[in-house]
Amino acid sequence: MATKEFYFAIIGHCDQPIFEMDFPVGEKKTKESEGTRHLNHYIGHAALDIVDEHALTTSQMYLKMVDKFNEWYVSAFVTASRIRFIMLHTHRADEGIKQFFQEMYETYIKHAMNPFYEIDDVIESPAFEQKATLYGRKYLS
């Protein structure tokens, strides 16, 4: 059975990633995984236009699977402030991804309410990363 792989990114208003994480967390990084990371960036950014089109046609925040590239599915979540959450995944896990997005949205809102955080700044908070890891293990495994 192939391993389940996930790549999560929060994309800001100017299409720049403000947070990224690979799941499963803790895997050893190899040259091949670095190449995969670059491919994930490409796939995620290529899907942004499709995400924006879907966001205009629905009032739902969770957009489910919006695109597929080779073995990677792309799911998305658009916040009320138009910050995009992108999830690349090799296995269909719609309910788990939806729950993960909802938990990360709540975590992002709490982080964004910090008076020292500027919207669209890169998120470098260890607490935010720990929450993402926790929710990834809880909902994506």
Curated annotation (Swiss-Prot):
Keywords: Cytoplasm, Endoplasmic reticulum, ER-Golgi transport, Golgi apparatus, Transport. It holds the Pfam family Sedlin_N. Gene3D superfamilies: 3.30.450.70. InterPro entries: Longin-like_dom_sf, Sedlin. GO terms for biological process: endoplasmic reticulum to Golgi vesicle-mediated transport. One of its GO terms (cellular component) is nucleus. The keyword Iron-sulfur does not apply. It is found in: Cytoplasm, Perinuclear region; Endoplasmic reticulum; Golgi apparatus. Part of the multisubunit TRAPP (transport protein particle) complex. May play a role in vesicular transport from endoplasmic reticulum to Golgi. Required for the systemic spread of the RNAi response. Belongs to the TRAPP small subunits family. Sedlin subfamily. This is Probable trafficking protein particle complex subunit 2.
